[in-house]
């Protein structure tokens, strides 16, 4: 559902000023008459930052991002993360890649893998080891790259660059650390890796909030089908 300006500001107000939700009032005419800025009503009274968390007013918050994910993810993972009984936000930023550019990228990646395998086999042959089996990690890289290329060329999938971020809040640092470990454990259960943004908490917060900015580098490659799990 599309939000108007007042509803968007209410979302930000309720995040920045938890416990003061009922006090939200947006009257632009009255603000202009008094010479007030709407930001004064939205922003917290103070902001403090450290390497791995922020303090907004009296609340602590921490921004996490999905650092790595499994080749297959159940759609229940996002549900488990967001069902956690805490004030939080989850954001998914996606940039589609043109199909011709995506195919070229995957073909180059596959060519690099095949070259590595060929060089490895040559080294084994030079040592008279003619029956050596290609290492599992190389074989897996080749298999996944071929499947990715097949998705793009025959299954009409699109290649996407994505970053998934989430912010959680707590009353104190101890609770924040405990909640963070709980969320990291949920991700590990699904063979994914959530991580804390180090020295990028403000950039992460500006990325996860619904204000249309992205300050974090896109670090994940996915197809439309695999990305749909997070929607």
Q: What label would you give each PLM region?
A:
Residues 1-230:
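Extended, folded cores of ATP/NTP-driven motor/assembly subunits in large transport
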């Amino acid at each position: 559902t599309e939000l108007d300006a007042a509803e968007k500001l209410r979302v930000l107000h309720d995040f920045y000023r938890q416990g003061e939700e009922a006090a939200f009032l947006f009257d632009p005419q009255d603000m202009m008459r008094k010479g007030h800025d709407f930001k004064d009503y939205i922003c917290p009274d103070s902001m403090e930052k450290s390497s791995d968390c922020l303090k907004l007013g009296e609340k602590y918050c921490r921004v996490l991002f999905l650092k790595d994910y499994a080749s297959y993810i159940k759609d229940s993972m996002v549900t488990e993360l967001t069902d956690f009984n805490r004030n939080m936000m989850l954001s998914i930023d996606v940039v589609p890649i043109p199909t011709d550019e995506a195919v070229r990228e995957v073909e180059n990646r596959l060519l690099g893998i095949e070259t590595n395998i060929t060089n490895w086999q040559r080294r084994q042959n030079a040592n008279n080891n003619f029956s050596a089996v290609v290492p599992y990690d190389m074989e897996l890289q080749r298999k996944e790259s071929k499947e990715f290329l097949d998705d793009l060329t025959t299954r009409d999938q699109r290649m996407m660059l994505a970053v998934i971020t989430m912010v959680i809040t707590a009353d104190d640092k101890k609770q924040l650390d405990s909640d963070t470990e709980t969320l990291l454990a949920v991700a590990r259960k699904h063979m994914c890796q959530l991580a804390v943004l180090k020295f990028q908490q403000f950039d992460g917060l500006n990325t996860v909030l619904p204000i249309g900015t992205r300050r974090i580098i896109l670090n994940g490659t996915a197809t439309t089908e695999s990305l749909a799990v997070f929607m």
